[in-house]
Amino acid sequence: YDMGLNYIIQGIMYLEKLIELVPAPANPVGNDDSSIVYKKLGIYLPEDYFNFLHVYGAGMFGNSLEVFSPFIKNPYMNFFNQIVILRDSYNSMKQLWIGLNLSSVFPTGSGYPFDFYPAEGGLIPWGCIEGCGTFFYWKPNYSGWEIVAYNDDEYQVFQMSMTEFIYNVFSSNIDFAGLSEITKKDLCFTTCQ
């Protein structure tokens, strides 16, 4: 899973495929200054995320899949706000999971084995499915940015970019319980302020 030129090209390719599937808004809401994010987090996020925000802006697909943005004030969709909220929630669940020794009871693919940003290699949230407990994170590692999808305490790791993941969700190429709410009616994008 190469983070170099191949990763960037694939991100662009899947963004173009996504635009064919779900047309982008004429006037996306947001800002193109990715340096704001680096200054605040101290890390560079995947380029396809900023390409997505440039084309689509802040908003959601249908009434379901939301993509957080650092460039809007809406607290429910603001990227920085969601980092704090989801970090606190995730870490609380992780401590409960460890305290009750639930990893010995539940199968692999359940629980909270990851650290959360700002820990090195910690999860960074980028989106969710509205109202159903499904969240999407990046997991940075030495070989690339993986996607970790969580539905309550069950998770799955996908080795693909964010735009590839979203495209595959809407193309029904990903089998994950938390995505069962996605339907053809969600093949539209609504901008948010």
Where are the predicted features?
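Short, surface-exposed beta-strand/loop micro-motifs that present aromatic residues
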Residues: 133-139
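Compact, glycine/acidic-enriched structural inserts
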Residues: 151, 155-178
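Short polybasic amphipathic segments
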Residues: 143-150
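A surface-exposed partner-binding patch
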Residues: 2-131, 193
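Charge-dense, low-complexity intrinsically disordered regions
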Residues: 187-193
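Charged phosphate-binding loop/patch that engages nucleotide di/tri-phosphates or the phosphate backbone
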Residues: 178-179, 187
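Glycine-centered tight beta-turn/hairpin loop motif at sheet-sheet or coil-to-beta transitions
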Residues: 130-133, 153-155
